[in-house]
Structure formats: structure tokens, C-alpha cells
Amino acid sequence: MMRYIIIFFITMLFFSSCEKEKSVIFDLNILPDEISRIELRADHKMLVPNGVSQMGFHTFVYGKRTVMSYGRDEETKEFYGKEIEEEFLIPKDQLPADYIKVYDQNGNVLEGSYYTTTTDAPGTVKQFYAKGGNLESERLSITIRELPDENYEEVVIPVVFHLLVPPATAAPSYDVSVELLERQLQRVSDAFNRKITTDPNAGKAKVVFKLATYDQTGLKMQEPGKNVENITAADFTAMGTSSTKTTQYLAYILANSKRIIWDPNKYMNIWIAKFTMSTSNTGTTTSYRMLAPTVMHSDYELTSIPGITMKHKDAFNLSDVTNCLEVGFMLNLNALLSPTTVQGKNEFSLATPIAEYLGVLQTRCDKYSYLNADGDSDYCPDTYSFDYGYYPTVFKGNNLDGQPENDPTRPMEYFTSFNVLDMYSYKNSLSIDQVKRVRMVLKQCPSRWAYKSNWAFTGEN
């Protein structure tokens, strides 16, 4: 009898413990009448009317809700709670599908929120707006800019990567495949030539980067564009035990210039090394080390390329090199193999140091005082200056540290970062004015004249 009683109680406990819990499902979707404001932003304020460049528009939809605000009265020291109305950004997946659309000034819907043209006259100011139901954004003005003169002769820059490999007895050895180097250079070429971007202000440099196929003695290279330098145990030990060996590697390159600095009139030199294990968001000392051009032909004014200190020199040969960075740059192996390792979300792109090597300046501006008199930071009027600390994303604004957003002398402008010199960017384009600067450097700076020789591709002068 007792056994049946125990079974009965166990059965009752079983059923009571499995009672279905009540569930509450909240519908977080926003109703149209809960939307209070629509904001429209664009990729840039100018569009090139070439039928390739596209102006992308981005909508930001806001709502308002009454919430409780809590605080403490400074005089009475008593705590209080009161209702206030707060505006909040509505996530796109909580909006009704296709409820917000972007229109041109004639009321035409923009397919995919992009606008491109070949017929709008330069100087035309087009207006666009976003609309959902009866609610519209403010009008956004976009200027159609002049078509740039792209009647350049295409130049091919031969590149040699020098792999500085430590001895296996002292540090992990490594290798980099020719296929990887080719892919890296192809992407740089594509970024320089407007092939992988929708940037509305992208330029076409007609500059191509290719791996050299002949070495400095005129012999065909077994692995195109790849020169391996095996550092001896003695030399590596002399570099010390620090995890950062930037200075030591630069000195090593110069001391062994006959092997690993190839004629700058025939090659663009890039040295790959694990010169530091440090990381930084900017990458300018951890991903690569470089110098802007240092010499200009005497036919040109030194001030013709502003922002760079140069001197006149009509030729630049191996015998003129006092710092290897005058004729190339050093690249951290970690940045090449794992682009986010040393720069975090500001993913490394080989196009960045190559553009700087060709005279383009950084667009970021950490302090308001860094700006030039015309409100610029890189001497290219069609790029935006920005404080990367305020905008760690591809979507940025031009307000800077210490400058209020409502400064009437510098109205707030939002833009999208495609530029290879922007931080937190798609890094897939150069602007039209940056392209002009690159072409000036290639024409005027003797240390950047490797493209004038076919030696790297033929083994002959």
C-alpha cells in the first residue's frame, strides 16, 4: 500500500513540475505614427557625372517615447523621478518594410537609394529627400562636379617585396606566397583606378602595380616580385631582444643595401618584416613605416606639392640613399597576413602606405588646430577632415575635437569613407584631387620614377 502512495505522490510532483510556463512575446516593431523624424545623409556632397560613380543615400529614422528620468535635487538632496520625452534612433529591422524611400527633387524614387548620372550639367545642384507616409526629411543638396581630366598615360610601377626572414633558431620563420602578393597589388591597382568602389567622388589614377619579373642583375626571378633575405643568427642577435625592432630593421636594410635595396629607378621597394608586435588603431608605426617623397626635380616649384618638405634634385640613385625609406617602405608581416590584428576594426590595406609613398596625406585630424587655413588637412579640397575618435565607422561627420556641431562657420556634413587614407573606411578609392596629387608626384619626384624603366619586366634597359 505504501508503495502505491509513494508512486502517487511522485506522479503528482512530476505533473506539477512540468506545468507549462506562461510566455509573453513583445512586438518591438514601430508603427508609422510612432516615427517623429527622418534624417537623410549622403556619401558625399559632390557627384562625378560619369555614369560609374554613384551617390548613396542613407536614412536615419527617429521616434519619441516618454520615459522616466531619475535624479537628485542639488538643493534638497532629495531623489526624484519625472517623465520626459526622449528621441531615439529606430533600428531598420523594426520599421515597416519599404516604408521609407528616397526621392529626387522631381519626386522620382531612387532605386536602391543610389543616384548616378551622365546628363546632369556640371555645377547643377540636385536636391533629394526621404519620405515615409506624410513625414519627409529636410532636402539634401548634391552638387554635380566637373568631369576630371583623366587623359593620363597609364603607368606601370614594378614592385619587389623583400622578405626579411629571421633564423629559425631564434624566431619562427615565415614565407609569403607570390599569389598573395599578386592579390594584394591587384586590389591596390583596382582602388587606384575606380574599379571596386561606388564612391561618388572617386578618381582614376591610371597607375598599375605589378610584381617585377627580373632581378637587379637582369636574371629572371624564380618567384616574381619576391626577394628573400635570410638574416643570420649573429645579425638577428645583434638586433636585441625587444619585441619592437623598427630602428634595427631599418639599419639592417641600409647596411645590406646591395642585396635588399634595389635601384629606385627600376623598382618600388617594400620590405616585409616582423618589426613590432605592438598594435594601434592608426597603424602608422605598427603596420608600416614610410616617408613621403623627399626630392623634386628643379623644373618644378617646391611649393607645387604642399604639405611635404622636399629639396631640389634632378636624379635619385642608389648612391643617394641615406635612409631606405626614401625609396620604399617597411611593412609589418602581421598587417599583411591578418589585417585586423594590428589595427583592430580599422582594417589594414596595402593601398594606404602605397598612396602615402606617392605623396598623398592622411585625412584624419585629431585636433582642430591641425587644419590648414582652408579647413583642410591633406591639401585635397574634395576630401573631408575628421576626428577618427568621434567616428570609428565608415559613416562619419566633419566635426572635430573642440568644435561644437552647431558651429556656423563649419556646418555639419556627414559622409561615407571610401578613401584609402581614411581610418575605419572601405579603403577602395582615391578622390579626384588625390589622384591629381599622385600624378604630380610621379611626374615631379625622381625617387618615384621606377615606372619609367622596363628593366623589371624585361631585364634590359
Where do the PLM segments sit?
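The catalytic-center signature of Zn2+-dependent metalloproteases
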Residues: C324, F329-L430
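Sec-dependent bacterial lipoprotein signal peptides
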Residues: M1-S17
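Bacterial Sec-dependent N-terminal signal peptides
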Residues: M12-K45, N461
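Extracellular/periplasmic catalytic domains that process cell-envelope and extracellular macromolecules
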Residues: E150-V155, N201-G203, I260-K266, L318-L325, ...
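Active-site-proximal segment of zinc-dependent metalloprotease catalytic domains
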Residues: T247-D366
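Propeptide-to-catalytic entry region of secreted or membrane-anchored zinc metalloproteases
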Residues: Y103, G133-P264, F275, K443-A450, ...
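Short, aromatic- and glycine-rich surface loops/edge beta-strands on solvent-exposed regions
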Residues: A121-N134
